């Protein structure tokens, strides 16, 4: 497999979208068109957009970028990487922006045709924000397995999504996950899981595996409307929920807790 390097570090989404600033896109376009035929894109970006101005619109702008790329190059799959942690940006007010970006990346793979995502939240960094060389090897393996499974229909390894959250009672919710994956939390402890309602944020204390899901209990009763977050902070807990094949559960932010026939993931 040949990879055409067009990456630029420390960039904003707007720099890759022809509908916005687009500077990096046009440089990429020149290089890509010189190569002739190609099969798809690898995308790992988002840290710079973890801010008040850009985070809330990331999903819509990413969707527009994908449409623009399809118009320019024809339809090609885009293999993406959900953001890893940042240990150098610990201002609590920034946590929500990291959650918004990670959730936009999760939603993109669920809602945009040809977009796929793998997790990186469990991997080591070199300086608190950049993935280590060992982490990049694992990311490459996950991307290759995703391509085999999603694009080529061959044995690989798929990512695990929180698809929806349902209320059971005022201290328990059911998370509906990608079918066919048994997800386990260490000692059934709900590290990095929170429910947010009109009274604020509450920690989740237990996550018990069931078929295609988790039963999560909260540290206090919650009120509806409420939303579920997982591994959403800039630097979430290091113990992450994983499936039986050691694939981490993708992070999510702001999933509405609602009855099954009303469930949405926003």
Indicate where each model-derived feature is located.
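Cell-envelope and extracellular/periplasmic
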Residues: 1-266
């Amino acid at each position: 497999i040949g990879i055409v390097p067009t990456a630029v570090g420390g960039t904003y989404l707007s720099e890759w979208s022809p509908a916005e600033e687009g500077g990096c896109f046009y440089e990429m376009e020149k290089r890509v068109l010189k190569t002739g035929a190609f099969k798809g894109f690898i995308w790992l970006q988002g840290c710079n957009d973890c801010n008040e101005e850009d985070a809330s619109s990331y999903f819509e702008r990413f969707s527009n970028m994908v449409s623009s790329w399809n118009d320019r190059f024809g339809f090609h799959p885009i293999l993406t990487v959900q953001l890893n942690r940042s240990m150098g940006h610990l201002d609590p007010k920034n946590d929500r922006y990291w959650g918004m970006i990670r959730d936009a990346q999760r939603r993109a793979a669920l809602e945009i045709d040809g977009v796929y995502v793998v997790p990186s939240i469990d991997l080591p960094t070199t300086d608190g924000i950049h993935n280590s060389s060992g982490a990049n090897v694992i990311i490459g393996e996950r991307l290759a397995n995703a391509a085999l499974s999603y694009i080529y229909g061959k044995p690989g390894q798929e990512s695990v999504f929180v698809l929806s959250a349902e209320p059971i009672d005022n201290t328990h919710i059911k998370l509906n996950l990608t079918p066919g994956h048994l997800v386990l939390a260490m000692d059934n402890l709900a590290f990095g899981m929170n429910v947010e309602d009109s009274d604020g944020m509450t920690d989740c204390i237990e996550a018990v595996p069931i078929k295609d899901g988790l039963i999560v209990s909260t540290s206090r009763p919650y009120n509806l409307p409420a939303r579920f977050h997982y591994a959403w902070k800039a630097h979430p807990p290091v113990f992450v929920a994983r499936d039986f094949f050691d694939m981490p559960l993708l992070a999510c932010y702001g999933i509405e807790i609602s009855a099954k026939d009303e469930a949405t993931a926003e």
